[in-house]
Amino acid sequence: DAKISQPEKVAEINLKYETGERYELKQVEYRMSDPTKPLPLIQKVLDSLAPWKEGDDYAFWRVNALANNLTNTRYFNYTLVDTIKPDPVQPTLELAPDLQALIDQQKIKQSQLLNSQQKAELARQKVTSAQEVTQDVVDETQFSGGQPPQAYALARSMPLSHEHDDDEEERQKLEEQTRIEKKIPVVVTLNADRLNSLETGIGYGTDTGARVRSQYRRAIVNKYGHAFDANIEVSQIRQSIDGRYSIPYKHPLNDYFNVVGGYEREERNDIGPDINLLVESAVLGGERVIKNPLGDWQHIIGLRYRLDRLTKKGDIDINELPDAFKVSGIDSEQESLLFGYELSKTNSNSLLNPTKGFKQTYKLELGTESLLSNANMAILTGGWRFIYSLGENENHQFVGRADTSYIFTDDFKKVPYNLRFFTGGDQSLRGFDYKSLSPEENGFKIGGQALGVGSLEYNYQFKDGWRAAIFSDFGNAYDKQFSNPTEYSIGVGIRWRSPIGPIRLDVASGISNDNNPIRLHFFIGSQL
């Protein structure tokens, strides 16, 4: 409707929209790419991946979320999600008689032109076929006992033609059924032929030497959606093996249990004058992971038992050791049973190679002497990471991180040595050796009761996928009074945006140290 008021020269237009009846979603139908193979998971697990129930309104985000869930579970080699939507029905447009006559006349002219073009093309093909009498490949069907070439070509194409026609006919029926019922079918085709995978990564640090890490994963252990992965890491000073068994609870991605266990062997050099330590640790625990499907906070509630064995290397009088060594027990076993709760949230524009993102993590662990722990303690930890890029092609990039921790205890000397804080290395203060920074007593590194480290970095993209970096790291592991000095380093590096994630090569110097040590660090993985 339109109303025009001449004196005010204002037109008032009222528009009415008829949106029609809203379409609903059917329950997802799952199929295997090989029809002879059964579905690898029970229907309950598969249904939990769809963020809707039958009868919910159709929305693209729901179908897209299903596709993402199928990929992120890592259960399948590939998936194909198909929604059967009917073509929109265009209502007949009512026109004035003179306009309708013009359109009909135009359609007749177009039809006559098309017919004349088709006739000319057919005549050209006949002339061409009469001229083409040479044959490069002998067709045996043209000899005795064979079909005429035209009949052979037709027979050869018939199976594919029938197959295509059947699929097209089935789809047309589904589309017509969808139009009538107002319910959209969603058909998912799955392939799970390769359930086992093996990945290997490498790293290098002047302090740790070369590092090799391998991960084995079994995507589907049984029809209930259980999964298993194991990791092995080997370097000059550290060797470890750990495993994780995942059990879906309410959702394979957003609510599940993990059973974890592992063994670690680490050499700690220069702990004190003429003394090194060999630390062996065994860990066993369980946790429940709860994630918000919309990318909000992730919660982890867990229980972890840790048994450490410390063996000294070197000749030293036991009386020369600080109390922090004597009480915790060098050449002895130390244990802790920690109840933990972790809260984390990550926002980023890419999981593999983010250019913008922010991650925050908060964790609380509690242990008591009355239950398999050497000390009464509460360990509080907070961590923050950010990446921010700007400018043309996001050439300018800023990266930062901060980590803080504190051990609340009535007697720090009883806290197991391996739960205390040490810093240094490519994940904390570059330019310093791995875990070389700590409060000292009589020249012995006794470990910190507090931790505070940070980093600021600027990257410039000088070529697509390549960035030059300059950075500074700062902080330390501190005693209760924060009396030991803050250390800091500066460095430069190179970044490459590889298909497997960022690859970083850094050279850093601990300039707060009188010796100005220079260290080389090589690392693969996101900085979030």
Regions found by a protein language model. Give the residues of each.
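Post-signal-peptide, soluble extracytosolic/periplasmic N-terminal scaffold domains
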Residues: 1-18
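Interfacial loop/beta elements and low-complexity acidic/Ser/Thr-rich segments
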Residues: 1-4, 22-27, 311-320
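Second-shell loop/turn segments in exported
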Residues: 30-35, 48-57, 201, 229-230, ...
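Gram-negative/organellar outer-membrane beta-barrel architecture
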Residues: 59-62, 68-354, 358-361, 378, ...
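Outer-membrane beta-barrel and related beta-rich outer-membrane complex signature
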Residues: 269-271, 309-317, 374-376, 395, ...
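Extracytoplasmic gating/loop element in the C-terminal half of outer-membrane beta-barrel translocons
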Residues: 391-471, 479
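C-terminal structured "cap/appendage" subdomains that terminate the fold
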Residues: 475, 483-503, 514-515
